[in-house]
Amino acid sequence: KDIESQGYIAPADCVEVRVTLDERERLVYATAEPEERYRLASSTDRKYRVVEALIARHPEEHILVIGQYLDQLHEMGERLDAPIITGETPVKERERLFEAFRTGEVRVLVVSKVANFSIDLPEASVAIQVSGSFGSRQEEAQRLGRLLRPKESGHTASFYTLIARDTVDQDFAQNRQRFLAEQGYAYTILDAHAIAA
């Protein structure tokens, strides 16, 4: 927070948006093996509508949709008509897409864990995290870090984390958020209905 107040990084609003699994998803989740539960909760269909609503809330901003599960990211890219960058994306294509994002030709970019490391996208002012590496504090900091480059406009960045309520997804999110709270970032918690009515 000290370096934020000195202008070295942008201020950020951190928002957790809680979705509720539908009846079918809850049944599948309840009967799943423990190691499958996080993936099921992270990939709930309810998150897609919330992502679309959040993008609509930020019509002029550069947005990163970040996740862990490739099938989820590919479906997200298709639904949003947005390009996808994963570890499978050739380096030249990644560079082309990153440049298109920087210049504004591409406004929404769907990215996997490759975005956690060594990319500089100061134009990004909104990140929507749909899934992550369990309770990784390092990953949370890296993803928030994508947004904290100083903005020419002095604009506040927005960091959204989409969580499936009453699941291990919510448990892991609390661990990641605890780290950011220790760094001085507060989370606002919203119900998905407040975003995607």
Question: Model segments located where?
Answer:
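Conserved interdomain hinge at the start of the Helicase C-terminal
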Residues: 13, 24-78
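A short beta-strand element within the Helicase C-terminal
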Residues: 108-110, 117-133, 139-142, 158-162
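Conserved segment of the helicase C-terminal RecA-like domain
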Residues: 146-179
